[in-house]
Amino acid sequence: MANASEPGGSGGGEAAALGLKLATLSLLLCVSLAGNVLFALLIVRERSLHRAPYYLLLDLCLADGLRALACLPAVMLAARRAAAAAGAPPGALGCKLLAFLAALFCFHAAFLLLGVGVTRYLAIAHHRFYAERLAGWPCAAMLVCAAWALALAAAFPPVLDGGGDDEDAPCALEQRPDGAPGALGFLLLLAVVVGATHLVYLRLLFFIHDRRKMRPARLVPAVSHDWTFHGPGATGQAAANWTAGFGRGPTPPALVGIRPAGPGRGARRLLVLEEFKTEKRLCKMFYAVTLLFLLLWGPYVVASYLRVLVRPGAVPQAYLTASVWLTFAQAGINPVVCFLFNRELRDCFRAQFPCCQSPRTTQATHPCDLKGIGL
């Protein structure tokens, strides 16, 4: 009796595991599509977000949504086939197509984040050049096209082969049978791009830290021969006193070193405090997205290195499954991170969707005049 009940128990456990896996994949798919589509609509509808950084973020969110829509249903289908024993994982053509799409979206995110890091550095370190040349939509369009072109060149032809029978990774990262180091080149290029992105942000951190050092003010004394103070250290008080009628003697000379601030193109100053805070918030948000990309793709890249360089069985199956699921989670986590790190996005979201506001916020936004109705 005990032996007869064991197969049924194992079958029930496998069915429960399959149901949990399909439910989790469905949840990831829905969260990714809902978050990325909502984020894209917010950027398109809000005019204050029509700037180059948010255009790049829009492209990143659309790519994540397409990746979730293309890859997660294939993983769900492979899981159902493996559980029902209805056939092997996808054939050679299907496996190469899935491998190409996975490599394309992965490299697109890596190259786009590298371009974003470079533009963030220019926005802080060379703000005048960035404001004149790179702040519009043409720069964002060029970066997006370059990211897609480089990703297409890196992912085509597919270098991944169907080497595993696991339903989580039906197209596992394997070395080619003829010994061509295709998968190894794929991994090395990805590591170089991600490492270069973090080096750019590290250089930006050093730049901000060097400019935060307090330097003592060097006071230049004003020149005075007849009580009319002028020169580099003059504050204009003597001229103001003379104009008000408190002075005697000749008219003081014009102050040196004061340039009139006009509305022209050359009148734009360096990075002021509010602009600096806005650029810093954008840098924090994009670096959080870049760091999460490294943390969620890092375990899978390490496992792939071990499978390519050592042997396919060198990686424990539990670690490989967990690393693959982390890459699935990366497709839907970017909108959450952006809303957490960017106050401007939260304000625009409340303005575009008033139904999501709390009652206290709504009452503060639309006050009611009780005296006007006699209360």
Curated annotation (Swiss-Prot):
GO biological process, one term: positive regulation of insulin secretion involved in cellular response to glucose stimulus
Cell location: Cell membrane
Stored InterPro entries: GPCR_Orphan/Phoenixin (IPR051509), GPCR_Rhodpsn (IPR000276), GPCR_Rhodpsn_7TM (IPR017452)
Residue intervals passing through the bilayer: 24-44, 56-76, 98-118, 140-160, 182-202, 286-306, 321-341
Tissue occurrence: Highly expressed as a 3.0 kb transcript in brain, ovary, testis, heart, prostate and peripheral Leukocytes. Lower levels in pancreas and small intestine. A 2.3 kb transcript was also found in peripheral Leukocytes. In brain regions, detected as a 3.0 kb transcript in all regions tested. Highest levels in the caudate nucleus, putamen, hippocampus and subthalamic nucleus. Lowest level in the cerebellum.
Bilayer topology: Multi-pass membrane protein
Extracellular side: 1-23, 77-97, 161-181, 307-320
SUPFAM superfamilies reported in the protein's UniProt record: Family A G protein-coupled receptor-like
Keywords: Cell membrane, Disulfide bond, G-protein coupled receptor, Glycoprotein, Membrane, Receptor, Transducer, Transmembrane, Transmembrane helix
Disulfide bonds: C95-C171
A Gene Ontology cellular-component term: plasma membrane
Glycan-modified residues: N3
GO molecular function terms attached to this record: G protein-coupled receptor activity
One Pfam family here: 7tm_1
Top-level taxon: Eukaryota
Side of membrane Cytoplasmic, spans: 45-55, 119-139, 203-285, 342-375
Family: Belongs to the G-protein coupled receptor 1 family.
Its biological purpose: Orphan receptor. Possible candidate for amine-like G-protein coupled receptor.
Name of this chain's protein: Probable G-protein coupled receptor 27
Source organism of this protein record: Homo sapiens
Gene name, Swiss-Prot/TrEMBL: GPR27
